[in-house]
Design a protein with these regions (language model features):
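C-terminal catalytic lobe of FAD-dependent flavoproteins
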Residues: 295-394
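Beta1/beta-strand and adjacent pyrophosphate-binding region of the FAD-binding site
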Residues: 3-17, 34
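Glycine-rich FAD pyrophosphate-binding loop
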Residues: 26-46
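Short beta-strand to alpha-helix junction loop
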Residues: 64-67, 94-103, 143-162, 286-293, ...
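Dinucleotide-binding Rossmann-like beta1-alpha1 core, especially the glycine-rich loop
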Residues: 50-129, 252-255
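Central helical "cap/lid" subdomain
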Residues: 196-244
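Active-site lid/adjacent beta-loop-alpha segment flanking the redox-cofactor pocket in flavoenzymes
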Residues: 235-340
Length: 410
């Protein structure tokens, strides 16, 4: 078992983002990297993710990034020997109104620019692709993206970590960071319960705990945990893991097959968030199932797939993805503290967006990032001209308007 040590680069967080950052930095030739995780790998927010990977986006920059990330997932085993269990089952997005049809048309236009294969389905084609959707009379349009799919979060994280270790990264579990030492305007060390370790760079990639870790370095950031839930049913006739991923934005629901069961969740319009000042580096961040919310998702999906009605629930999942007030990633170095770097504010894209965010982070450290990557800098929140109350309300609103699609993208 590895132990913390002095290192040039210290990544804090052993979920999808931290693991991806470790791998991509090492792949770019950076050496002397350690990753510190306070518990076990993929035991917190990443483990609760549904794993959807969608490439169809309304903006060219975001679509190209998700396409590049998906190619990483698709070819990772070939390139490294470790599988991410990416399932390319395709995805269907339904529109129930003319407004939503226009959104799908915008996505299709962007896909044409980026070369992503998509097509609008007739009702007959929709029934062929998704036979368990027995009631589609209210569907005005259906957009098919055949190269989308889903991941298993544990496989994703373990693959990143295994490949990173092969490239020389030290990965340490059960090593909670308790202090970040800043002197002369620069990072000097990190401390765990085992001791103090010199480091030139600390990369905070700890999901909903990222604000608490930044606070250890004297920095306040609006990284807001927002509760997200989904459930998996007992076996339901007709459902299987080869069915496409399904999104119905106007009823705020997503679903896919999980073996012979149904995985169903969504983005309710009255979310639950936590003031980041109330989260410490040791906070547990647990939640009980909200059966009103989960029942609402089930009822909405059953309107289209009546076989779901009455299905028993086998498991529920509650996670706290971190949201930013403007709905954009918080990625890159902090100008005010040399050596402090953020990889946070994933806005529910932590697993699916892990490769893209890590590529952005590597670019942000290159010395010549693109204007888009510069726009993701944590410097937009430093110095603090915002209030925690406003930040929490705005970040929660990003969650609540995830479906239908918000006007900004991470």
């Amino acid at each position: 078992m590895s132990s913390p040590r002095d290192a040039e680069i210290t990544i804090v967080g052993g979920g999808a983002i931290g693991a991806a950052v470790a791998y991509f930095l090492a792949r770019e030739g950076r050496r002397d990297i350690q990753l510190l995780e306070r518990r076990g790998l993929c035991e917190a927010t990443s483990s609760q993710a549904a794993g959807f990977v969608g490439q169809a986006r309304p903006t060219v920059d975001r679509a190209r990034l998700t396409m590049a990330a998906t190619e990483i997932y698709r070819t990772f085993e070939r390139d490294t020997g470790y599988t991410m269990d990416y399932k390319e089952c395709g995805a269907v997005r339904l529109a129930l109104s003319e407004t939503s049809v226009a959104e799908l048309q915008q996505i299709a236009e962007t896909a044409a620019v980026t070369g992503l294969p998509v097509e609008f389905l007739t009702h007959a084609q929709l029934r062929d692709i998704y036979p368990v959707l027995e009631r589609t009379g209210t569907v005005k349009a259906a957009l098919w993206s055949p190269t989308d799919g889903y991941l298993q979060p544990n496989s994703l994280v373990n693959a990143y970590v295994s490949a990173a270790r092969d490239l020389g990264v030290t990965v340490v579990t059960n090593a909670p960071v308790t202090a970040v030492e800043i002197a002369g305007g620069a990072v000097r060390s990190v401390s765990t319960e085992a001791g103090r370790y010199r480091t030139d760079q600390v990369i905070i990639a700890a999901g909903p705990w990222s604000a608490a870790l930044a606070r250890l370095a004297g920095l306040e950031l609006p990284i807001v945990p927002v509760l997200h839930e989904y459930f998996v049913t007992e076996p339901v006739p007709g459902w299987h893991g080869d069915l496409p991923c399904l999104r119905i934005p106007e009823v705020q629901v997503y679903a896919r097959g999980e073996s012979n069961r149904v995985l169903c969740g969504g983005f309710e319009n009255r979310g639950t968030s936590i003031d980041p000042r109330e989260v410490s580096v040791s906070s547990a961040l647990r939640a009980r199932p909200d059966w009103d919310v989960l029942g609402g998702f089930a009822g909405s999906l059953a309107e289209f797939a009546p076989a779901l009605a009455g299905a028993g629930v086998a498991a529920t999942f509650q996670g706290w993805p971190a949201f930013s007030p403007d709905g954009r990633f918080i990625v890159g170095p902090v100008s005010a503290v040399r050596g402090l770097v953020l990889a946070a504010g994933c806005n529910a894209h932590g697993v699916s967006g892990s490769a893209g965010l890590a590529m952005h982070l590597v670019e942000s450290l290159s010395g010549d990032p693109s204007p888009y990557v510069r726009s993701l800098s944590p410097d937009r929140f430093v110095p603090r001209t915002w209030s925690f109350e406003d930040a929490r309300r705005e970040a929660q609103a990003v969650y609540e308007t995830y479906y239908p699609m918000p006007s900004v993208t991470p």
